[in-house]
Amino acid sequence: MTTAPTTAMALPSRGRVGMACMIITESALFTIFVVAYLYYIGKSLSGPYPRQVLDLPVLATVALLSSSITITLAVRALRGAQHGAFNLWWFATIALGAFFLGATAVEWDHLIYQHNLTIWTNLFGTTYYTLVGFHAGHVTIGLLLLGLVLIFSLAGAVRTAHAERVEVLSWYWHFVDAVWVVVFTVVYVIGR
């Protein structure tokens, strides 16, 4: 009786497993905030209300979603040992994310100083700033991590051998982008 040779299945790296676990955990937290936002839509006893003060952040959304493309191109460039292209695409990702974060800051300035909407104003203000702020916090963390990688790369410390680690970090950025699609839909489409 002959047996077929068996091949060992490679286990995913600790980085991949760790990032996947973190994304699952963060997804649960975002789900709680999204459900709370949906539950409290229209329950504020006083204004301002979403339809009165929220504009669609279209350019910011396009910038953030485009950053998923640029980070994918950066990872591909690093895998192909194209370090100049990696730095360019990685920088583009940071620039697009920074534009998104800046647009969020401008929106908040407008809401606070022109519409007097703060986290304490009403249920809408509380749930809006909690959900959108939680996302903005994740964008900020992502930008800091992306910035560190760029600094190391410009110093020559990021090589093709680091492509898997860079790709794992890109998963976080894709997660931040995917969460924004949900937040945008809930806050700016359904919630208005």
Each model region followed by its residue ranges:
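...captures the hydrophobic TM-helix bundle architecture rather than a specific catalytic motif
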Residues: 1-192
